[in-house]
Amino acid sequence: MTQMTVQVVTPDGIKYDHQAKFISVETTDGEMGILPRHINLIAPLVIHEMKIRRTDDDNHVDWVAINGGIIEIKDNVVTIVADSAERSRDIDVSRAERAKLRAEREIEAAKSAHDIDEVQRAQVALRRALNRINVGNK
């Protein structure tokens, strides 16, 4: 069986390291499906839900919340270097819900203050929280 190694690395260490037969990621150019023997590539990633079909279980899908970064594909090794990443089983959904509410409040306060930079920062925080909630509920 053809397979590839998938690793997700953050400043806190390796968050994911398994053999896979398919992964789905989202780059700045859109969604990308990756199979073994994919052409070598480096691309920037956006905040998204990464889907991984491992080789050891046809019916199981691993989900990882990726909060930006880059993907490198080289010689059947897929390495994602991300600012932060969490597997679905590790996400505290209630904490993510609180982060969502906090970000929504910060967006409203920044809009009232006409602080464009703060609005953008809070919008990124909201996207991250929503991503974590979606992945955590899978």
From Swiss-Prot:
Pfam families: ATP-synt_DE (PF00401), ATP-synt_DE_N (PF02823). Signal peptide: none annotated. Keywords: ATP synthesis, Cell membrane, CF(1), Hydrogen ion transport, Ion transport, Membrane, Transport. GO terms for cellular component: plasma membrane; proton-transporting ATP synthase complex. One of its GO terms (molecular function) is proton-transporting ATP synthase activity, rotational mechanism. InterPro entries: ATP_synth_F1_dsu/esu, ATP_synth_F1_dsu/esu_N, ATP_synth_F1_esu_C, ATPsynth_dsu/esu_N. Produces ATP from ADP in the presence of a proton gradient across the membrane. F-type ATPases have 2 components, CF(1) - the catalytic core - and CF(0) - the membrane proton channel. CF(1) has five subunits: alpha(3), beta(3), gamma(1), delta(1), epsilon(1). CF(0) has three main subunits: a, b and c. Belongs to the ATPase epsilon chain family. This is ATP synthase epsilon chain. It comes from Streptococcus uberis (strain ATCC BAA-854 / 0140J). The lineage of its organism: Bacteria, Bacillati, Bacillota, Bacilli, Lactobacillales.
